[in-house]
Amino acid sequence: MIALGVNIDHVATVRQARGTTYPSPVEAALVAEVAGADAITLHLREDRRHIQENDVVILRDRLKTRMNLESAVTEEMIAFACRIKPHDICLVPERREELTTEGGLDVIRHFQQVSVACKRLAEAGIRVSLFVDAQAGQIDAAVEAGAPVIELHTGRYADAATPEMQQVELETIRTMAAYAFGRGLQVNAGHGLHYENTVQIAAIPELSELNIGHAIVARALFVGFAEAVREMKALLQQARA
């Protein structure tokens, strides 16, 4: 069965919009676990636009599933992760002006920096994932860097302008998921997935986990957070039925 990682970033986005103490991303994470989430994903950005350090610290001791911490490959963030010791860390690219992560980590270009980070995190007992575009070269670089897991960036698929273009992107993800799996990696995927486009991705047999957040938070406005998680979990189960 494919796992569902629920990203709680945008619960924190609502909180930070007014500088209040609510809604609590910690509470959202605990509700998501009860509703069937297999992991909780959260991105501690350098600009701290949503998730804050204290959210990570509190959740680390309260989660019953797994914490998947997303972070940039910086000394500050790697040191923080080594101190907190999440179950998993997904290294992502980051630009302050972006609305959300816009593409995969260029492991080829930043190979030395990524390799050092992978080694350091692994020595701290943290499983490392690299968020990469669905390209063989990036997958090969991830293997060489020592990452046991990759997360394929599904943004181009999610943002495709036509059904035909989306199908092309889907085939690319299918091909690269199989390629990465064949190279011995655990293969996850995420970015831009929602209730209308997730089943096709979840049906790819080599994928182990999907990380989904914005769509679940948006759906929760109308049906509640627990039900939004349950509905997404049902779609993943449907895809593997």
From Swiss-Prot:
**GO BP, one annotated term:** pyridoxine biosynthetic process
The domain of life for this entry's organism is Bacteria
Pathway annotation from the record = Cofactor biosynthesis; pyridoxine 5'-phosphate biosynthesis; pyridoxine 5'-phosphate from D-erythrose 4-phosphate: step 5/5
List the catalytic residues: 43 (proton acceptor), 70 (proton acceptor), 191 (proton donor)
Gene Ontology terms, cellular component aspect? cytosol
> Which reaction equation describes what this protein catalyses?
3-amino-2-oxopropyl phosphate + 1-deoxy-D-xylulose 5-phosphate = pyridoxine 5'-phosphate + phosphate + 2 H2O + H(+)
List locations, semicolon-separated: Cytoplasm
Q: Which InterPro entries is this protein grouped with? A: Aldolase_TIM (IPR013785), PyrdxlP_synth_PdxJ (IPR004569), Pyridoxine-5'_phos_synth (IPR036130)
Gene3D superfamilies registered for this protein in UniProt: Aldolase class I
A Pfam family of this chain: PdxJ
List positions binding 1-deoxy-D-xylulose 5-phosphate: 9-10, 45, 50, 100
Q: Which key words are in the record? A: Cytoplasm, Pyridoxine biosynthesis, Transferase
The EC number of this protein is 2.6.99.2
Task: Cite a single GO MF annotation.
Answer: pyridoxine 5'-phosphate synthase activity
Q: Which CDD domains does the UniProt entry name for this protein?
A: PNPsynthase
UniProt xrefs under SUPFAM superfamilies? Pyridoxine 5'-phosphate synthase
Q: Which sites bind 3-amino-2-oxopropyl phosphate? A: 7, 18, 192, 213-214
Which chain positions carry the site (Transition state stabilizer)? Answer: 151
Q: How does it assemble?
A: Homooctamer; tetramer of dimers.
Q: Which PANTHER family does the record cross-reference, listed alphabetically? A: PYRIDOXINE 5'-PHOSPHATE SYNTHASE
Task: State the function annotated in the UniProt record.
Answer: Catalyzes the complicated ring closure reaction between the two acyclic compounds 1-deoxy-D-xylulose-5-phosphate (DXP) and 3-amino-2-oxopropyl phosphate (1-amino-acetone-3-phosphate or AAP) to form pyridoxine 5'-phosphate (PNP) and inorganic phosphate.
Q: Which NCBIfam families match?
A: pdxJ (TIGR00559), PRK05265.1-1 (NF003623), PRK05265.1-3 (NF003625), PRK05265.1-5 (NF003627)
In which family does this protein belong, per the annotation?
Belongs to the PNP synthase family.
Output this protein's name. Pyridoxine 5'-phosphate synthase
Name the source organism.
Nitrosomonas europaea (strain ATCC 19718 / CIP 103999 / KCTC 2705 / NBRC 14298)
Q: What is this organism's lineage?
A: Bacteria, Pseudomonadati, Pseudomonadota, Betaproteobacteria, Nitrosomonadales
